[in-house]
Amino acid sequence: MKPLFIFGLGEIGKIVLRNLSKKEGVKLIGVIDIDPQKVGKSVYEITGIEKFKDVYVEKDAERVLKKRKDGVVIHLTSSYVKDVIDQYFLILDMGHNIITTTEEMTDPYLKHPRLAKKIDEKAKKKKRAIVPTGVNPGFAMDLLPIVFSSVFEEIKEIRVERINNASKRRFPLQRKIGSGLTPSEFKEKWEKREIGHVGLAESGSIIARTLKLKIKNFEETCDPKIAKSYIKTDFFEVNPGYVCGILHKVKIETEEDININLFLEMSLDAENPRDTIYIEGKPSLKLEIPGGLPGDESTASIAVNWIDKIFEMPPGLWTIDRLYLNHYFKKI
């Protein structure tokens, strides 16, 4: 039985536990969270999953992680590298592998090359693997088009569009897309990075790095989507003229004349939600997932399904460009 820990019991953490309850060969040893309303309670009390009735939520991460060695931690706490690096180091010092959903870790070398190098070196020193993952970033707008590229003889452009209906999503997500703000409030908060999606820039850069493309020009914009009619969700009421979502774009030009264009709409009552990959080249093809991949459920599943492989992986930080994937290349 492989020892398993959960670090962060938010909504995705609960879905991870539900997913884990159906798996064999792993044993949940501990759950870590700082929420006083959860600390001291059994996982069963919080999730209703009877299989984990003997596991309790604890605040002291070091105490929990010391219970067993040579395990894996599914890490679900923050979007930003600077917020999680100390948590990673503690986990590695305690002798565990890491599966993390921290969005910036999709390509930590983009904004935090020094910290990324430290994480990689620490993992190698401790002889453990750390795998960043998720559905977006981590799959829908980066890993999936990278793998899709392997069937192309030539590529001129990679274009990915994800349109996500946020009306039924959790409160933090509806808040982070600016629901109910005025356009000027949205602009101010986006400039401070207090709202918006984290990881689209990383998706673009990791596509370029994996395909060995040199970035010539990189542009990222995020505009508000304005409600045309009254919208009501479980958490927000948005009147016409106010913000109901984000229109987020990344445009990359490369020295190899292969353009990468990513577009993400996350909005309340978004019409025709879908994930679409267009690759122009030889041949030119379109891959579409009607309805789109469900964000929270898919993130939980992809994290859990990494457990099977992480114990076989060499030590170090395994970003997408280091995985042994077949993909398009123009030069080696």
What are these regions (language model features)?
Residues 7, 149-275, 293, 300, ...:
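Active-site-lining helix/loop region of Rossmann-like oxidoreductase modules
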Residues 1-93:
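N-terminal glycine-/serine-/threonine-rich beta1-alpha1-beta2 phosphate-ribose binding loop
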Residues 10-12, 80-81, 105-109, 135-141, ...:
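Gly/Ser/Thr-rich loops at beta-strand to alpha-helix junctions
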Residues 97-99:
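A short hydrophobic/small-residue beta-strand
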